[in-house]
Amino acid sequence: MEKERIIKLSELPQGTNCIVKNVNGDAAIRLRLMELGFVENEPVMVIKNAPLMDPVEYQVMDSHISLRRNEAEKIDVLVTDDTPESPLNVINKKIDFESFELRTCPDTEKCCNEKNAGKKTINVALVGNPNCGKTSLFNHATGLREKVGNYSGVTVDAKVGTFNFNGYSIRLVDLPGTYSLTDCSAEEKYVFYFLSNCKPDVILNIVDASNIERNLLLTTQLLDMGIPVVVALNMYDELVSRGDSIDYKTLGSLLSLPVVPTKASSGMGIPELLKTIVDVKESDEQHLLHLDTSGLNVEEATAYRYRFIRELLNKVYKSGDKAKHRKAYNADKILTNKWFGFPILLIFMWLMFEATFTIGSYPQEWIEMATEWFGALVGSWLNDGIFRDLIVDGVIAGVGGVLVFLPNILILYLFIAILEDTGYMARAAFIMDKLMSKVGLHGKSFIPFVIGFGCSVPAIMSARMLENRKDRIVTILTVPFMSCSARLPVYLLFVSVFFDKYQGLILLGIYLVGILFAVITSLILNKVSFKGVSKEFVLELPPYRIPTVRNVLIHMWDKSVQYLKKMATIILAASVIIWALEYFPRSNGDDMLTDNNIEYSYIGKFGHAIEPIMRPCGFDWRLGVALITGIAAKEVVVSTLGVLLDAEDEDVSLKEKIRSIDGFTPHTAFGFMVFVLLCTPCIAALAAIRREAGLKWAVFSAVYSTALAWIVSCLIFQIGNLIL
């Protein structure tokens, strides 16, 4: 006989199957859980606990969702001895498809008039769930290279691309991923506002074919907007490969909209999709249908829509082998294992830094030799004088000192691309949530932190994925303590000079110091400014995917172009300005650049003025000036040293000149790297903080981090002197 009992979802052990009976809690969390699939009569399976036993991974509607135990406690479930049926076969009340109240959109005439007004331009809004392949499709269609990744929250604002197709100019707007059009998050509000006010000609709804039931919830809401909808059934190859099948033509007929199967990562189906958009634009009739949910509250409407979707899929969808469904998550048996999860994460991080230094050192040496050779060659062509000094000591020494670290930065971005594209980024957040919540940080904050290893600006912007303002602000203010790639040239330079035997470990140590002070800052902010409770940890764990070589190479190429552009603009300008400030004023007839001249130059006088502040940290005036110029961009620290130390002997490498600085010891060098790590973010990052959090927090970040950098570096130097 079947045994049944009602229990809290949080109380179930791993491997238990159950059926949702009720969702409790406040309205916002109830709605979010329902949108993710936790609706009445929906089967759920408890997959596993995180290594620290919280959060917990659940399978619902062919997706894997991470919930903290206090969130899972809000869900009442029915446990049976039998494995629940497929959700497509579990419907609490059998209904006929025709019983759903579908009607023609009252705004059809208005939409058609707006459509005809801009005959040669089609405005298309790209809408879909997070991580459904929107941005990949956007890149293939437009030829642009926006960031893609296998985790939710990659797109944080609207991206626009325009291209020509069949005589039309198609303006494609990639909107942030959203589970619905309610107002549970900033992304949902943004998407709803855009669709309501900008009125695109066509909504291109990207539906993840491998998780179609949940994705169609958004589709039913888009049908209510009064705008023609075209559905791209993306990742169609994954659906087929696991033995599932769907009659997408019948699906389109029942929804009164065109459905086109696609594979955005390779471009499959995109030409047909664009042709369908043009056909919709040229069509004289637009039969826009939607569900009549009048008289229902938001939660009732969500449940009603899922009933409609279940009945719809019963007509067109056939599920294959469930073992193939689980195949995409098999790696979790090891990567998020109770015993192996943390060690594997730490090993990966160490490997990233070790490879960045070890592998990158070979091309770095080649570029360094080429730069020195080129500088000597140009110097031999030019006559002694101001112009020669500008080119050799200013431009080549300054820009060349930064150029040599390009291979290391590309290797770092290679590892970050692998983290993002495989889906491991979300697993890292899953593993770290319990630990991070103890120090006042949200588990999702780990994603901006890892992005921050590349650049603080997109990392700060990605904090928008956090729904709670407190979590968002704390994350934004702690992200700059992650060592971005702009700081990497400084670390690599000093590590190679003073820590040759332990390069990988010292580099990892610097990154860990940044994480440590991010934690300390979070604790301070939570104690002083933010005393509220963090938002719930609701995170989708995407299936593992093998990164495409194309996406990884594009990611690395784009970063190299950005780096080279920065060298051709900010770093070049800074190098020339620093050279001019060190070159002038000059006495009559004195055209030689010597250490004595630099002492009395404009920059020398400025450096000596701030030297009393820097001396307690063990830094002379040249190091102090380099730190100040690093506010423009952290790479400028290296180019500044390249200019300031290139005085009399052009044949000696920058590393040798740094090693020869009086009193500059390994612990002083470590303190200098920590100062670069902790001091005020660059101008671009401060602007991002101001835009995302406000002027007050941008000023706080600059002042607090600079004071912290001085105190910590001073302690390292003074304690080091006592011990060594």
Language model: regions and residue ranges:
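Juxtamembrane inter-helical linkers in multi-pass membrane proteins
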Residues: 369, 373-377, 381, 426-456, ...
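Hydrophobic core segments of alpha-helical transmembrane domains in multi-pass membrane transport
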Residues: 344-354, 412-417, 495-497, 511-524, ...
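Transmembrane helix-loop junctions at the membrane interface of multipass transporters and ion channels
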Residues: 481, 485-508, 684-694, 713-724
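Conserved C-terminal guanine-recognition region of P-loop GTPase G domains, centered on the G4
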Residues: 163-166, 190-259, 490
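Short, membrane-interfacial amphipathic segments enriched in basic
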Residues: 314-328, 380-388, 539-554, 595-599, ...
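Canonical P-loop GTPase G-domain recognition
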Residues: 239-287
